From Swiss-Prot:
Subcellular location: Cell inner membrane
Subunit architecture: The complex is composed of six subunits: RnfA, RnfB, RnfC, RnfD, RnfE and RnfG.
A family per Pfam: Rnf-Nqr
Gene name tied to this protein: rnfE
GO CC annotations on file: plasma membrane
UniProt keyword list: Cell inner membrane, Cell membrane, Electron transport, Membrane, Translocase, Transmembrane, Transmembrane helix, Transport
Gene Ontology terms describing biological process: electron transport chain
Family matches, as InterPro entries: NqrDE/RnfAE, RnfE
UniProt topology in membrane: Multi-pass membrane protein
Topological domains annotated Periplasmic: 90-92, 145-181
Name of the protein described by the UniProt record: Ion-translocating oxidoreductase complex subunit E
Function of the molecule: Part of a membrane-bound complex that couples electron transfer with translocation of ions across the membrane.
Protein family per UniProt: Belongs to the NqrDE/RnfAE family.
Record organism: Vibrio cholerae serotype O1 (strain ATCC 39541 / Classical Ogawa 395 / O395)
Length: 230
C-alpha cells in the first residue's frame, strides 16, 4: 500500500480526527449548525493544517526540541491570522457568522497534534499529504454533521451558501421540508452531541461489517514435541 493511500485512509476513516481521535469537538459542535458554516470552518482548518505541516517540516531540523511547541504555536497562529484576514476580506458574512471560532483554530488539538506527531518527523511532501487528508477528514465530518442538523432543524440545505461562495450561490438553497418553526434541539449544541454520537456509532457498525467480511487468518496449531529418555 502506497504512503499516500495510507495517509488518505488514516485521515478520512481509520484515524479520522473527529470520529476516532475525537479532537476539535468545540468547533465541531458549535459551528456545524449549517452546511455553509461547517464548510467554511472546514476549509479554513484544512488550509491551516497543510500550511503548518509544511512549515514545521521545513524548519524541524533548525528548532531546538526544548522550544518546539511554542514555535509550532507561533507558526499556527500566523497562518490562522492570514486565513482570518482573507475570510474577512472575501467572505465577510461568513466571517461574522463563525466569529471567535476562526481564531480558536490556533488552539485546535488536531493541528498542533499533527505538527508534533507527524510533520516534525517527516519530509515536506508526506507532511503536506498528512495535513491535507486529516483536514479533509475533519471537513467531511463537519459537512455531514452540518447537513444533518440543517435538514432536521430548518428543513433546508445550503442555506446561506452565498456567504461563502458569493451571490450566485443563492440558487443552491434547497428546501427539503417546510417547518413553521425551527427544531431547536438539532440546531443547538445538544443536538450536535447526539449527531456526533450517531456518526461514531455508524462508523463502528461499518468497521465491524468490514472486519467480518475479511477472511480470518487461522493460526497454525503448534504441537510441543515430547522428548523422553530412551
Amino acid at each position: 500500500m502506497s504512503e499516500n493511500r495510507t495517509l488518505m485512509l488514516n485521515g478520512m476513516w481509520n484515524n479520522n480526527p473527529a470520529l476516532v481521535q475525537l479532537l476539535g469537538l468545540c468547533p465541531l459542535l458549535a459551528v456545524s449548525s449549517t452546511v455553509t458554516n461547517a464548510l467554511g470552518l472546514g476549509i479554513a482548518t484544512l488550509l491551516v493544517l497543510v500550511g503548518s505541516n509544511v512549515t514545521v517540516s521545513l524548519v524541524r531540523d533548525y528548532v531546538p526540541k526544548e522550544v518546539r511547541i511554542p514555535v509550532f504555536v507561533m507558526i499556527i497562529a500566523s497562518l490562522v491570522t492570514c486565513v482570518q484576514l482573507l475570510m474577512n476580506a472575501y467572505a465577510y458574512g461568513l466571517y461574522l457568522s463563525l466569529g471567535i471560532f476562526i481564531p480558536l483554530i490556533v488552539t485546535n488539538c488536531i493541528i498542533i497534534g499533527r505538527a508534533e506527531a507527524f510533520a516534525s518527523k517527516n519530509d515536506v511532501l508526506p507532511a503536506a499529504l498528512d495535513g491535507f487528508w486529516m483536514g479533509l477528514g475533519m471537513t467531511s465530518v463537519l459537512v455531514v454533521l452540518g447537513s444533518l442538523r440543517e435538514i432536521i432543524g430548518n428543513g433546508t440545505l445550503f442555506d446561506g451558501a452565498d456567504l461563502l461562495l458569493g451571490e450566485w450561490a443563492k440558487v443552491l438553497r434547497i428546501e427539503v421540508f417546510h417547518f413553521d418553526s425551527a427544531f431547536l434541539l438539532a440546531l443547538l449544541p445538544p443536538g450536535a452531541f447526539i449527531g456526533v454520537g450517531f456518526l461514531i456509532a455508524a462508523k463502528s457498525v461499518i468497521d465491524k461489517q468490514i472486519a467480518a467480511r475479511q477472511p480470518k487468518q487461522q493460526k497454525q496449531a503448534i504441537e510441543r514435541a515430547r522428548v523422553t529418555n530412551v
